[in-house]
Each structure stands twice: as C-alpha cells, then as structure tokens.
Amino acid sequence: MTEDWQSQKFRQNVISKIHDLLPPNAQDQTKNAGVMENHIFRKSRTKDEYLGLVAKLFMHYKDMSRKSQQQQQQQQQQGGPPPNAEMGGGQNMMQDPLNALQNLASQGNRNPQMMPMGAGGGAPVPGGPGTASNLLQSLNQQRPGQQQMQPMSNIRGQMPMGAGGAGAQQMMQVQQMQQGGNAPGVMNVMGAGGGQNQGQIVGNPGQQMGVGVGMPNQMVGPGPNSGPAVGGAGGPNAAPGAGGPGPNQMQGGPMNVNAMQQMPPMQQIQQNQLGMGMNPMMRMGQGNGMGGPQGMPGQGMQGMPQGPHNVVGGPAGQQQVGGAGLPPNAVQQGGMNPMGGMGVNMPPNLQQKPNMPMGQAGQMFPGNRGGVGVGGQQPGQPFMRSSPSPADAQQLQQQAQLQQMQQQQQQLVVGNQTPTQQPPTPQMPTPNMIPSPALVPQSSPQMMQMQNSQRNIRQQSPSASINTPGQVTGNSPFNPQEEALYREKYKQLTKYIEPLKRMLAKISNDGTNVEKMTKMSKLLEILCNPTQRVPLETLLKCEKALEKMDLISYSGQQFGKSSNPLLEVINTTLQSPVANHTLYRTFRPTLELLFGTDITAPVPAKRPRVEEKSTSFEQEVPHVLQGEIARLDTKFKVKLDTTSQINNKAIRLICCLDDKRLPSVPPVSVSVPEEYPWQAPDCSLAEQEYSATPFLQTVQQALIARISKLPKNYSLSHLLDTWEMAVRQACSPQSKPRAVCELSTLLGV
C-alpha cells in the first residue's frame, strides 16, 4: 500500500484538490494544477515527501489568501498604491504557481537554521510608502530534522516612489541577515521617479566599484576583515551630492577576488532582486546555494557562493531602474526575464531548474513604482523581506491583458524609443535598451566554476542568451517539456539541410517550378536559422513534407552525410549498374602489382573423347541403300524396324503404300541383306493381316505370283513397284486375274 501514491488515480485526486485550491481568476487552472502536481511527484521519493510538499502547497495558498486580505485593508487605510504596482502601468502581477511550487519543493532538501529577525523602520517617503508583507511564511514551518525557527515579524520596507519624474533622492531600507564571522557587505539601493539613486555595498572601504545601471551606483566589495560600516543619513548610505562619484566609476581599486574566496562558505550572501513588473515568485539561479545551517529557506536572502559575480544581480552585474517617466518595459539586469510582459529574456543560469532547491536562490518581488530594493547583509540590523500579495481577480485579469498589449508595443518600438519624462543617462542611450555585459567587470573562471559541495549543482554559462543592446526578445512560449521536444525535432531535421540545398540549386538551374522552389526556400530558412522559433506543429508539418520529397536523387547518396568528395564519388559509382566492372577494371592492376597474380590450380589434362558405340544399322547401312531410299516415290513411306536390328546383320525396313488413288493396305516388311545390291531383298507379308479379307488375300496372291516372276537380282525399288501393281491388280473389275508372265512383271503391268 506504500506505492499506491504513485498510481494515476491517487495523483488525479491530488490534482483535483490543487485545482480547487487555485484562485478562480487563474488562467488555465487544469494545466497549472497538473504541472504543479507533476513537479511535486518528480521531486518526491517517498509518499511522506509527496504528501508533505502537497501540504505545504495548500498552506502556501491559504497564507497568500489571508495576507492578500490584510494588504488590501492596509492599502485602504494608507491610501497608497499596491506594493506590487508595476512601473509605467501600475498593474498587479499574478504569482506564477510553478515558480511558487519550485520554491516549496526546495524545503525537502534544506535544513536551515533561522536567525532572529526584528523590525526595522524606514524613513518616510514622499508620495506614500509602499508596504511589503511576508510572502512565504508558510515555508518556515518546521519539518522533521530541522531546527526550530526564531520568531519573525513583518517588516515594512520603505519603497521610494518618485512623483512623476521628480529629482528627489530616496533610499530603500536595508535588507539584512545576521551571520557570524566576518561582516559581509550591505547593499542599499535607492530608486526615485526621475532622480538619481545610489546603492552601496559596504565592506572594505578601499575596494569600491561603480556599476552602471542607468544611475550612478556605488558598490564596495566585501572584505574578509571588514567591520560594519553603516552610517546615518550623512554616512555611506546618503545620496551623492554634486561632485559625487559618476556612473560606472571605479573607486579605489578592483574587487579583491582572493578576499572573497577566503570567506567561509557559511557566510554567503545573496541579494534579493526587486524587479519592476516581475513575477513575484520568480527565482534567480545565482549558482550553488548555501546548504548549511545558516541558510534561510523561503526568505528574501539565501546562501550564495562568494564570487565576483555576486554583485548586483548575477553575472551581468547590472540593474537598471527607471522612474515614472520610463517606459513600462523597465530593463532588468543581465538579461533577466521579468515574466510579466517585459520584453527581456532570462539566460539559462537565471532560469528555473527543476533539480535546484527552490529556497536556494533569491526571490524577486515587485516593489513600489520606481523603486528597486536589493538585499544585503549587515550585522546588528534586522532582516527585511519584501513580499507582495495578489489583488482581486478583476484587477489580475485586467493586468494580464494590459501587459500583453504593452509587451507587443515594446517589441515594436525597441531600439528607437525615447523617454518622455526623464532624459536618458550617458550609460543608457535609450531607456528600453539593455546594458551590454561588456560594461561590467567579468568574474574569474575559478569563481565561475566554484561549486558548493553540499548541493553539487552545476552553474550554467550565461553566454548562451545574454542580451546585448537592441536584442530584447519576448518570453518563450514553450514550457520545458515542449522546449526539449522542439530542440530534439529540430536536431533530427538538420540532416535535410544539404539535400534541400542541392534540390534548390538544381531547381534554380532548371528555371522551372518556381512555386516549389519558394516552398523549399522557406523550409531551408527554417532549418538553417535556429533562432527563428516556429510552432512545434509547423515543425512537424515540415518533417512530413521532407519525408515525402525525393531527396535521395538530389543528395547523391542514400546513406549518411559526408563532406568527403572521394566518398561521394565512390558512393555514386557503387549505385551504377556497372559498378562491379568499374571496380574490377580500376583496382585489379593495382592489386596485381601489390600482391601478384592469384595462384590457380593447374589446368586438368585433356582426356580423349569416348566415342559412343554406334548401332549396327549405322555401321551396316550402305550408302547405296540410303541413296535409293531417298530417291523413292513419295507414295512409298520407308522406315527402319528397330526391333529386329539387334543380332541380325540384315536391315529390316517397313514400307507403307500411301496413294490417294489406291485403297489402304497393310505395310510389308522388307529385309535388305548385307551384300545388297548383289543380293536381292526379301519381302514378307503379315499372314494375319493379309488373310483377313478376300481383297487382301487377292493382293497377297498377286504379289507372290509377281515376285516369283522377277529376275534373280532385283532392287528395293523394283520390289515396291511390284507390290503396288499387285494392289492395282486386286482392284481390277475382272473377277479372275490374268496369268502374270515375266514380261508383264518386268514392265510393271
């Protein structure tokens, strides 16, 4: 019964419960519920883990519903905009259920120790402060084997909001987490509608680095022995005055990479990214997270390897913050995907990985309009989390529609749009242009390849899809399963590229069938350009069309694809009907020179032909008899009597009379002696045949009488003529035949 949780019936029941739990305004609830359940199933090894993750999901949605009601009440009391107001549009973002689920699933692989958190106040901000509540409080529930979590209170982060392009400088409250040992850096980010914002990472004061994010930001790299250096309003957190550091200005020297590498792995920091219009539950994969007891699952700040790329948002290390006058497609750092209608792609190392613990990376939350908060660390300061809550269903539906319209408009005007209320800074010619990665100091290869031994999660290179200026793209319409299927199908169709090129070359040379050439050109363009994404159905149609085509005749080969001309010529020759003859004629002389001629067996000796013994007839029939038979009249039919040729040297012939003017009579047997023609042949009649009728008896008597009157030596021809005259005499109308004399016999009358 322990394996019944893997059955389809059990899983379908869980999917239906998740489906009922989802908000009624969520789009495509069936798909989202199925995707979340499938993700939990793949992450779970036992039934307890499976049920535990499902229970956490239920608690998460219930907690979100409760906090949504609390935030709506706070908004009504304060009269300010919702904390998840989007830049340029002020639209609420709906949480991605799959991202929330991935954050929940990470709880099964973490054993963190929660540090005490207090409440920190923020300075009042003109225009009304924004509120941020705890989003994933349910994730902090204690699991078996985890240590008890300290109490935590909600912290209201003061999000600066400019008043339509005002030049006021605002500062966001510091987000911190206590850790023992060396003091990690603290990053403060200030955002205003149109003014300058300054963010500082306070660590080693002698190591500072400016990062161009469209506003002059200062960053101080953390040092191993640096103490806490957080001042008041006039300290390091103060906004720069006239003559302050310019954008992208290096202060002091480069970051001390060795110092960062020397920091203990348990003292790792990771920033919280607050992107305008970003999906609240989007996770930024910054590499290998911290798996020690000081990791904080579900919080806004998680463990991260100490590396050079741990500077303001990942490898690219830049974040651009636009005020109220900027277009709604506020550019995020390093090609991060806002997932909420922004035309920016997220590189693979920032995407969600199913095998990465979800609590490992930082969370991205939408803050107040015009402000971005980046979490850091500082001893002695309370920890703050920014957590939005979804608004009512009506607003969410309107937001989704407006975001789609804005995304389409942004993609059309990207690269040539100018700001309406805030002039562009020198670092960013146009507000919707993504800063190039070349502007940010690159991290060393050793730090990029550093892995956490407790997690052993590989960090992907961001070079595959880092966006450069003018290369802003939209969100990918494929989920991971469809993406893998699309790439596999595209890889299978690449074998048709060379045959298609040859077919197009042949058709273009012929100058006929222009329509077919156009279709082939479109197919070739789809196959040769991997960046041109087409629907998977279109790719399947292309595969069917390519399978129906006779590409073998154009490819010149039926197996394999080779770039060697010699192999192609040999393959073409082998397909010829005279291939064997061609190979024999081509290679036989060479093989004979190399190996010599083949040693064959000796020719057998000629044996004399054994002559067959001829019959006695062939030996004894003289030519005189053969000539006489050949000259007989056609009415006489003569053939050999083979039955009497064994022991008798005489030749026995059977003679038939075939004359249409005479009646049919039985044949006679003639025996030709060996001494013929010097000895007369002998004629014998069959007694039974010639005594059958009176007519035949008359023929027999007449023949005997005539033979008796013949001379001593007569020939075969004379004997046959006598037989004919005997038949004629028997046919005479005279009843009594005349006496035959010798003269009449000789004359044949």
Swiss-Prot record:
Biological processes annotated in GO: follicle cell of egg chamber development; regulation of transcription by RNA polymerase II
Record field: compositional bias (Low complexity): 69-78, 393-420, 441-463
Principal subcellular localisation of the protein: nucleus
Biased composition (Gly residues): 229-246, 368-378
Subcellular location: Nucleus
KW Transcription (keyword) present: yes
Residue numbers spanned by region Disordered: 63-95, 221-253, 351-479
Bias type Pro residues, positions: 421-434
Pfam family, one: Med15_M
A GO cellular-component term linked to this record: core mediator complex
InterPro entries, alphabetized: KIX_dom_sf, Med15_C, Med15_central, Med15_N
UniProt record similarity statement: Belongs to the Mediator complex subunit 15 family.
Self-association state and partner proteins as the record states: Component of the Mediator complex.
PANTHER family for this protein: MEDIATOR OF RNA POLYMERASE II TRANSCRIPTION SUBUNIT 15 (PTHR31804:SF3)
Role noted for this protein: Component of the Mediator complex, a coactivator involved in the regulated transcription of nearly all RNA polymerase II-dependent genes. Mediator functions as a bridge to convey information from gene-specific regulatory proteins to the basal RNA polymerase II transcription machinery. Mediator is recruited to promoters by direct interactions with regulatory proteins and serves as a scaffold for the assembly of a functional preinitiation complex with RNA polymerase II and the general transcription factors. Required for activated transcription of the MtnA, MtnB and MtnD genes.
Protein name: Mediator of RNA polymerase II transcription subunit 15
